[in-house]
């Protein structure tokens, strides 16, 4: 039985699962380490009104979260996940690449090397770190040697710690409360008291369809990406109420509607979700909730929940949550990637 598999001990002794859960279990400590790293960078307070964020994939989701946080304070932001970024006058340019070798991010950054005093990079190493050393760009270093998607808390903590130094203090959080929430998601918690295990069992038997609204758009997208990468599950992702005017007509028979919920959820959205549940049946829907009633803490808890769900789903499917065969192979055969890295190596001398 699937419950026996997730509640057993032997499966977590397999090296790929042991390592993946080990990385995830360090979530709060990794965030705290990132904060310390960001706070250690020498910087003066500045008036920040316009921010450009460069990043893609596991690093790009960090850009998304930071952009949402900054926007909530009235700061104009743009997240670029392309090969080139929009020109313009920016007070701050944030480049995030865990490996330091992300071609899209590096190519975009080449446009702004004459504004090195406005740039801050978050990375573990690679060409981005070398570029910082050569040009005097500020670099927030995070620990190396792990898959980028598992370094989300390190990178988020790193850039939030740096933003504190600029006078933008967003990191007042109750980390002990987040740790307490995480304890309920770990592998030693049985399925009947572990929402991540319970969700994974349902997802493993269905076609997952993730519906989000503005307040939970990012946690929902995180779940989609982690199911893709860790569990090798293809899933649908759409925003409501828009999705309720088209794709609900095509929900497959084995479809499972997954909706992250927020304490900031608008009344109209709440009633819409209630109606959708009545229409499809409660057995066809799965709600994901955090415990915190603080904006940033809720985001982190929902991300954490999504990550654990994806790992438990990978266990049930018997796939390796650490290896990405197609993504890495595509990088190897993509001539654009090699051209960008060649140009950057010329810049580095």
Language-model segments: residues:
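Glycine-rich phosphate-binding loops that contact phosphosugars or nucleotide phosphates
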Residues: 40, 44-187, 201, 260-286
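Rossmann-fold NAD(P)-dependent oxidoreductase module
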Residues: 69, 111, 226, 308, ...
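Phosphate-moiety recognition in structured ligand-binding domains
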Residues: 2-37, 46, 130-140, 151-156, ...
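A short acidic, often aromatic-flanked loop/helix-cap motif at beta-alpha or helix-coil junctions
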Residues: 86, 145-150, 243-245, 291-297
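Short, glycine-/Ser/Thr-/acidic-enriched flexible segments
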Residues: 58, 215-216, 242, 262-265, ...
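Active-site phosphate/pyrophosphate-binding segments
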Residues: 18-23, 33-50, 164-255, 333-349
